[in-house]
């Protein structure tokens, strides 16, 4: 069985680190914004161990002062080509 992970963990870590925030400080800022979390929750997000719902994405973006789409990794043309070829392969008769 394939394990799925959230895609934004590494980007959240980079954005948090760029602001000079510890996981504890980031968790406190998220709590002030209304999100129920703690340092352990931030750690799990960054380690890609938990799925994130829309509300969580909005809290993260709000506190980090970025657009939600900036939380997701950038995809290059190679990724899109690979996706296209994978879809093409699965639709062959």
Give residue ranges: language-model regions.
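A short, Lys/Arg-rich alpha-helix, primarily the initiator
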Residues: 1-19
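Short, charged recognition helix plus adjacent turn
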Residues: 2, 62, 72-93
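Helix-turn-helix DNA-binding elements, focusing on the entry/boundary residues of the two helices
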Residues: 12, 23, 39, 54-57
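Hydrophobic packing within well-folded, soluble alpha/beta domains
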Residues: 12, 16, 26, 60-61, ...
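Short alpha-helical DNA-recognition segment
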Residues: 19-44
């Amino acid at each position: 069985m394939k394990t799925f992970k959230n895609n934004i963990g590494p980007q959240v870590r980079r954005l948090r680190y760029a602001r000079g925030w510890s996981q504890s400080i980031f968790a406190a800022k998220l709590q002030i914004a209304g999100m129920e979390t703690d340092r352990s929750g931030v750690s799990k997000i960054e380690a890609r161990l938990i799925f994130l719902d829309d509300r969580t994405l909005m809290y993260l973006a709000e506190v980090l002062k970025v657009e939600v789409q900036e939380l997701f990794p950038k995809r290059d043309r190679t990724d899109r080509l690979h996706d296209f070829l994978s879809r093409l392969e699965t639709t062959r008769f």
